[in-house]
């Protein structure tokens, strides 16, 4: 029985093997009869990427990244490949507005797709052994096509790293508002 419990506690108690069920009773204030639900557990894949062709000639790839979750890089790559099959793409608009961030590894993987080489990001811990650097693998997969990244005050964390790395490597123009600013971000890339 959970009454007004924290979301993380409820979440942990409801997790279990796929295909098994959980009985859920919801009691509402000022309503005598509770609501009864039987919920079957399953894997839910969050769709973090949406895309479409834009522009007068439909030759710009618009990709909206809502967050950086476990499958964002695969979803992102699928969108790019579908664009390249349909038409000659002249550039990309990457929309990170209101993207709260997510998994650093996903931001690194997607950033790598647009860089020829070089450092994407480094993380520094209290100890020297906690310092890590992440580098792009050789090869810009979109072959230098222009990129515009849209950000706003809701763009945070991994989305700031993504936008910052593309800007530092002169691979993108950043448009919009200042980002959330939750990172201590400094650039070591050459100007």
Regions found by a protein language model. Give the residues of each.
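A short, hydrophobic C-terminal helix/tail in secreted or cell-surface proteins
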Residues: 2, 188-191
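Cleft-lining beta-strand/loop regions that shape enzyme active-site pockets
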Residues: 5, 10-184
């Amino acid at each position: 029985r959970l009454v007004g419990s924290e979301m993380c506690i409820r979440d942990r108690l409801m997790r279990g093997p796929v295909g098994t069920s959980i009985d859920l009773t919801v009691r509402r204030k000022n309503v005598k009869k509770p609501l009864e639900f039987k919920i079957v557990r399953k894997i839910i894949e969050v769709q973090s990427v949406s895309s479409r062709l834009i522009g007068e000639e439909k030759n710009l790839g618009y990709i909206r990244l809502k967050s950086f979750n476990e499958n964002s890089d695969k979803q992102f790559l699928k969108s790019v490949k579908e664009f390249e099959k349909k038409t000659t793409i002249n550039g990309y608009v990457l929309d990170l507005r209101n993207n709260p961030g997510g998994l650093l590894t996903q931001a690194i993987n997607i950033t790598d797709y647009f860089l020829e080489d070089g450092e994407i990001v480094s993380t520094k811990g209290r100890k020297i052994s906690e310092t890590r650097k992440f580098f792009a693998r050789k090869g810009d997969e979109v072959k230098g096509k222009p990129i515009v990244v849209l950000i706003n005050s809701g763009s945070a964390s991994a989305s700031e790293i993504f936008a910052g790395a593309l800007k530092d490597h002169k691979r993108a123009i950043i448009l919009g508002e200042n980002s959330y600013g939750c990172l201590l971000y400094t650039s070591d890339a050459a100007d």
